[in-house]
Amino acid sequence: MKSLRTDRQINGLALAEASGTAFILAAASLLLCLSMQAAQAQITFGGGAKQQKPTPAEWEAVANAIGKSGSMQPGDVFKIGLPRTDLEVTVRGVQLNPVLALGSWVAFKKSPNMTMVMGDLVLTEAEVGPVMWSLQESGIDMTALHNHVLDESPRVMYMHISGHGEALKLAEALHRALSYTKTPLETPGKATLKTRMPARIELHQLEVVLNRTGKENSGVYQFSIPRAEKIMENEMEISPAMGVATAINFQPIGEDRAAITGDFVLVASEVNPVIHTLRENGIAVTALHSHMLDESPRLFFMHFWANDEALKLARGLRLALDKTNSVAH
């Protein structure tokens, strides 16, 4: 015989069902809340998503700590240029404009949990030891030390650096290291500029030959040409403004001539084709080396020098660029 449920049993079942439904809804609400918090944390701190950008005030504090103003570059990079306007360096009778080959710089980029700094410091031989000691004491790594040009007088060296940590502490450490040099740290707008040489070459002529956009900086025509692939180091993308773009500089030296220098950023398979092309076009290779320690793909930096008719040199440089996986115009 089929049993009949009492009102108490029916009410009990209804209450249990209602309680179960409420529990499920509460659990779902909790999971949704946790999911939203996790997504927000990913946005704030990284994990492949967009991270919070430093405020202008944060970068201003970095600039003040170093003692020199800087500017934002593509890729959320804050870069400070430190030209060695205190040095008078000649190469085979050509006095170098500091912008051509004597430009120290440091560049900062915020990562999810810290700030990265990379840089290139132009140093006299006497400055190398004290600067290296100061950086090592502060936890900033030296990743390379070498020449960029040949036959220069007085001798100059180039120290490449890399560090990770809190941005202001990195800036303070760099200021201490720079205090062992005579690098000018003038207030913005008061840097000493060299007198420009008379010239019959113009920027747009070089742009046409190189098929790239350049800029004029204190009498030097500059081109920065990024590589097409991403450059990574320690799971962080290295922006071109942090020293991984091919740099080509022209210093007019009268009439239609220019002194050129810079560096090609290359993978291993490109090294010898570019050497061959440069030499075929009267451009000397002055150095080949690395600037970093853990980058991917592995990069080689090839420095060059020539003093000749500017458009002729530009044509040779264009042929060399065509041997590389560089971003097109």
Language-model segments: residues:
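N-terminal secretory signal peptides that target proteins for export/translocation
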Residues: 1-20
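Intrinsically disordered, low-complexity regions enriched in polar/acidic and amide residues
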Residues: 8, 36-41
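Bacterial N-terminal signal peptides
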Residues: 20-37
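Long, contiguous binding/interaction regions
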Residues: 42-155, 162-299, 303-329
